[in-house]
Each structure stands twice: as structure tokens, then as C-alpha cells.
């Protein structure tokens, strides 16, 4: 029967897309078209009665917690494999986090350390799984290693200085310089270096091995150099440029400028060791124009004179490039000069020649020269120094102006305008005096005034003269008159008025005001006015007093004495004045 079923023929149903046996195909096709329908989305056959349920359960749109919309039948798969907000467990602490924050958390969590119970070391949490494989081996490797003493680190620059000096020596010999160096200067240099080493440094195994390797390398290079023909200057120039760039990498200068600065520093260092005489001997070898330095009076070529005077000027106070003690003056050969340079490289002074030590000092305190005297000072002190510098132009002019006489001591000009301006700024008057002047001005008579004289000044002068010239009242003691000052312009004006009165320009009853005294002593004063009636004098004083602003103290003193000597006449003058006023 099974063989019969396998051998029977089938046909494809157009509705449900399934293979149906031929003998049952007609009945199935009728039933399928009546009861079964095809889903338009998933293309699967479903009963027509369950089609709505299928669409609502499988193909409706839902929103995931990551705000993504998809069909409901795909939501489960999305949440398990694709959703970025799905939960995941940290591999270090078993904490559930979203997949977005899991990587950041694992990096932070794995950076923690935990103490290993076997080796006693702190191990990172992320390395705990692989730590048992290497646990205990790192301690054995450290114990087998040879510890490098601290002195070996201190001598690292000494080794670099030896290597740099040796390389520079070879490059200089290859360039055929004008001054000839000794054939084997390195041997003497190496011996000096080893004599300077202490016994503790010689016993260091690592340091000795480094030195041996260095000298073996030097000997090997010398043998290769003797066997090979001389090369062209391209490779040597490249090595020299590399050495200069290495030594001046902090300067930021061009290669040519850096090379000039380097050799200038070498020459100045040699000069500090051997004195200026050795440098002058080297420079004097060439037939050049030699000029004397204005500070040390040594002869130098014309091209190097400015640089030398800059460093030789005592007022510049330039710091020395060499910290060692200077040797006594004497003529040194070229090989001795270069030996000193190599010794500086071995004694940690090559960094000063390269300008490395100065850069460290600059970081600590900036040194700036004074713009007036050139003395180099720290940045904090420079401002106060320049403010009090002796060579500052503003400060120098103050010293010069001290010897110039003041304007007060110079003779005054004869211009009449200057005294008038000065009178207005003289001593202040008391308040009581001003009140009296105002009251008398309101009651007193006025006279014709010239347009050139101010009215207030004339009125005040008139009141003062009328009070001073009037005699004492009967039964009262004569009081001394107030003292007024007379300026130059007013005195000249009064003298002109006196001359006009004598010529008849003024009425005969008017008299002139007192002239300024010729002496400081009141005994020598001779009055210039006639002894006329007091009433006329009072009238004259009223008319002429307006032109006089102040009266000299000597004239006032003379009036007080005259009043005391002749009381009867003054009393009679006072009675006559009262009669005229009535």
C-alpha cells in the first residue's frame, strides 16, 4: 500500500500551492477554494475564518523599546539579537547592563585590581583569567636581573657626551679644517676621562660593558676608515648635520645659524679656560684687519670684533658659559684647545655649549637686559630697576634741571600786566574787612573813574584811605590805620597823577597819594604831600584813593606817628571834616 502511495501522481493546487494526489485533486480543489485562503503578507495558507486572527497576531505593527517599529512575529527575534537596549551580563562582575553601556562598563570594571593569593601581587581584573599561567614567574625574572645602580643613570649624559665628542672629532678631521688637530687625540681624552672616574663607578658592571662597547665601536670604525678609500663629503656632511640638529633641537634655528652659534660657544668656552690670548693667537694667524677691543684692548678681526665686545663688555654682566675654574693665561696649541673642548663634553659641560642648560634656567627665571644700562636682570626685578636706573633719560633730566635756577629767583619783567595778575592771587582778606567795605561802599560817594581801572578795586581803596586819613573822633584814642600794599602799576599810576596835579590838570584841592618809600627804615621817610586842611585831604583821598588798590606799610606807619605827634591838628581836621559833611 505504501508503494502504491509513492507511485501515485500529484498535481499542484493553485490556491494553497501544495501537491495534491491526482485521484483526490478535484475534491481538494473544491474544498480549498471554498474554505482556505492565502495570506497576502507571509504567503501562507490559512482558513478564511482565521485570517483576521492571523493578521492581528502575526502581522500587526508593534514598537520596540528602542523605538523601532516592526511586525509582531519578528519582535522576539529582534529583542534577542538586534535590539541595542537588550540586557547583557558583564564578564567581570556579572552585572546586567544594556548593550550600549556594556563596553564602557567592562573597560572600567576590568581596570580594577585584586590581590593574588599565590604571588601577592595586585592583578587587573581583566587579567585574572590569564594570570595563573604567569603567576610567580615575573618575580623570578626580576630576581635574576642585575639591578642598575642610581649612579649609572647619572652617567647617561656622560656616555652621550663621549659619543658626541668622538663623532664631532671624526667629522672635523674629515672636513680638512684650517687648523690641524693631533693624529690621535682620543687616546689622551679617554685616559683623562678614566682618571676622572671614581672607584665606585669603575666597579659597575653595566657601565664598564657600555664603555667597552663604545671603545670597540670606535676602534672598529677607525679600522674600517683606514681600509676604505676616503669618501666624498656628502655622507660626512649629513652626519654632521644630524649631530648639529640633535644638539640644537631645542633652539628652533636654521642649520647654518645653529652651527655658527655652536662654534661661537666653543670659542668663548676656550677663551674662558685659556684667556683671550689663546683666541687672539688663533685669529691672528690669518692675514686680516685687526682692530683693538675697547674694553680689553686685545686685537681681533673686524668680523669678530662686535661679537667679542658684546661678551667682553663688563656692564652687560653676561653669565659665563663655563662653570669650571679658568686656567692661567698662556699660549695654547690647537690640540690643547680641542682637548679642553672634549673634556668639557665628558664633564657634563657639553650641555652648556649646546645651550641646553640655559634653556632650563630660562624656565625657572627669565633674564632680560635693561634697555638703558644693559645689565641682565630677572623679569621680576627688571621693572623696578629700570624705574630707578641711573642711565634712564627721564631720570637724567631731573638731575640736570636741579642746577637750573627757579623762575622766582629770575629778575621780573617790567611789563605792567604781570603785577596785575599777581595782585589778584595775593593773601586773602578777612570776612570782617569785606563786610566793612560793603557797608561803606553803599553809603560813600563815588567819583568819575577812568575806564581802565576796575570799579570794585577803586571803591575798596577809597574806603580804606578815608578811614586811615581821617583823624580820631573827640574823646577817642587814635587807632593805627590798616596796612595795605601797593603794587608797581598802581605806584606808577599815582606818580603820574601827582605830576598832573602839579601842572594844574587836577583841581588845587586834590593832592597825590604817598609815593613808595626808598628805604626799609621808617625814620628816613619824607612825606610828599603838603600839610593842607584835613577836609581837602579827605576829598582828595576819596578821588585819588579809587585809583590806589593798596598802600605800603611804611606809609601807614608814618601816618600813625604823625597822628600821635600832632593830636590837636588832627582833632581840628576831624571837626572840619564833620562840618563839611553836614
Swiss-Prot record:
Superkingdom, natural source: Eukaryota
Pfam families on file: TRAFD1-XIAF1_ZnF (PF21366)
N-acetylalanine: modified positions: 2
UniProt keyword list: Acetylation, Metal-binding, Phosphoprotein, Zinc, Zinc-finger
Gene Ontology terms for molecular function: zinc ion binding
Start and end residues of each stretch annotated as Disordered: 216-238, 402-509, 522-582
Compositional bias per record (Polar residues), positions renumbered to this chain: 454-471, 486-504
Sequence positions bearing Phosphoserine: 191, 278, 320, 326-327, 409, 415, 430, 470
GO cellular component, one term: mitochondrion
Protein purpose: Negative feedback regulator that controls excessive innate immune responses. Regulates both Toll-like receptor 4 (TLR4) and DDX58/RIG1-like helicases (RLH) pathways. May inhibit the LTR pathway by direct interaction with TRAF6 and attenuation of NF-kappa-B activation. May negatively regulate the RLH pathway downstream from MAVS and upstream of NF-kappa-B and IRF3.
Protein name: TRAF-type zinc finger domain-containing protein 1
Gene name for this UniProt entry: TRAFD1
Amino acid at each position: 500500500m505504501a508503494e502504491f502511495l509513492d507511485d501515485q501522481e500529484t498535481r499542484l493546487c493553485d490556491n494553497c500551492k501544495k501537491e495534491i494526489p491526482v485521484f483526490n485533486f478535484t475534491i481538494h480543489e473544491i474544498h480549498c477554494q471554498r474554505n482556505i485562503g492565502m495570506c497576502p503578507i507571509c504567503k501562507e495558507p490559512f482558513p478564511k475564518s482565521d485570517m483576521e486572527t492571523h493578521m492581528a497576531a502575526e502581522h500587526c505593527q508593534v514598537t520596540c523599546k528602542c523605538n523601532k517599529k516592526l511586525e509582531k512575529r519578528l519582535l522576539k527575534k529582534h529583542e534577542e539579537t538586534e535590539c541595542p537596549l537588550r540586557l547583557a551580563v558583564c564578564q567581570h562582575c556579572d552585572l546586567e547592563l544594556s548593550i550600549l553601556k556594556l563596553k564602557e562598563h567592562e573597560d572600567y570594571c576590568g581596570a580594577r585590581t585584586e590581590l593574588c593569593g599565590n604571588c601577592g601581587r595586585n592583578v587587573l581584573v581583566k587579567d585574572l583569567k590569564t594570570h595563573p599561567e604567569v603567576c610567580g614567574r615575573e618575580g623570578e625574572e626580576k630576581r635574576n636581573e642585575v639591578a642598575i645602580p642610581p649612579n649609572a643613570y647619572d652617567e647617561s649624559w656622560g656616555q652621550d657626551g663621549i659619543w658626541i665628542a668622538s663623532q664631532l672629532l671624526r667629522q672635523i678631521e674629515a672636513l680638512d679644517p684650517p687648523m690641524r688637530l693631533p693624529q690621535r687625540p682620543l687616546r689622551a681624552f679617554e685616559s683623562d676621562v678614566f682618571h676622572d672616574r671614581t672607584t665606585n663607578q669603575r666597579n659597575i658592571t653595566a657601565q664598564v660593558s657600555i664603555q667597552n662597547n663604545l671603545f670597540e665601536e670606535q676602534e672598529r670604525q677607525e679600522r674600517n676608515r683606514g681600509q676604505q678609500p676616503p669618501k666624498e663629503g656628502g655622507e660626512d656632511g649629513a652626519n654632521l648635520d644630524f649631530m648639529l640638529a640633535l644638539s640644537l633641537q631645542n633652539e628652533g634655528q636654521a642649520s647654518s645659524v645653529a652651527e655658527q652659534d655652536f662654534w661661537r660657544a666653543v670659542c668663548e668656552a676656550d677663551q674662558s679656560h685659556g684667556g683671550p690670548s689663546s683666541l687672539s693667537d688663533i685669529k691672528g694667524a690669518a692675514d686680516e684687519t685687526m682692530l683693538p677691543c675697547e674694553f680689553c684692548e686685545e686685537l681681533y678681526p673686524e668680523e669678530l670684533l662686535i661679537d667679542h665686545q658684546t661678551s667682553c663688555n663688563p656692564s652687560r654682566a653676561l653669565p659665563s658659559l663655563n662653570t669650571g675654574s679658568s686656567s692661567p693665561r698662556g699660549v695654547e696649541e690647537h690640540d690643547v684647545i680641542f682637548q679642553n673642548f672634549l673634556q668639557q663634553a665628558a664633564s657634563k659641560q657639553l650641555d652648556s655649549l649646546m645651550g641646553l642648560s640655559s634653556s632650563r634656567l630660562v624656565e625657572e627665571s627669565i633674564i632680560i637686559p635693561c634697555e638703558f644700562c644693559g645689565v641682565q636682570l630677572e623679569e621680576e626685578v627688571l621693572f623696578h630697576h629700570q624705574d630707578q636706573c641711573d642711565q634712564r633719560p627721564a631720570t637724567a633730566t631731573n638731575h640736570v634741571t636741579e642746577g637750573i635756577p627757579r623762575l622766582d629767583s629770575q629778575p621780573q619783567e617790567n611789563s605792567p600786566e604781570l603785577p596785575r595778575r599777581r595782585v589778584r592771587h595775593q593773601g586773602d582778606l578777612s570776612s570782617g574787612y569785606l563786610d566793612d567795605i560793603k557797608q561803606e561802599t553803599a553809603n560813600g560817594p563815588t567819583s568819575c573813574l577812568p575806564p581802565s581801572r576796575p570799579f570794585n578795586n577803586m571803591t575798596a581803596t577809597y574806603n580804606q584811605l578815608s578811614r586811615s586819613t581821617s583823624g580820631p573822633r573827640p574823646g577817642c584814642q587814635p587807632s593805627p590805620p590798616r596796612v595795605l600794599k601797593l603794587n608797581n602799576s598802581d605806584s606808577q599810576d599815582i606818580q603820574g597823577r601827582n605830576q598832573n596835579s602839579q601842572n594844574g590838570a587836577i583841581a588845587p584841592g586834590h593832592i597825590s597819594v604817598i609815593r613808595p618809600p626808598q628805604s626799609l627804615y621808617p625814620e628816613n621817610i619824607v612825606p610828599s604831600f603838603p600839610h593842607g586842611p584835613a577836609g581837602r585831604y579827605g576829598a582828595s583821598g576819596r578821588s585819588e584813593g579809587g585809583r590806589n588798590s593798596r598802600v605800603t606799610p611804611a606809609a601807614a606807619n608814618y601816618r600813625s606817628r604823625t597822628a600821635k605827634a600832632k593830636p590837636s591838628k588832627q582833632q581840628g581836621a576831624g571837626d572840619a571834616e564833620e562840618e563839611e559833611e553836614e
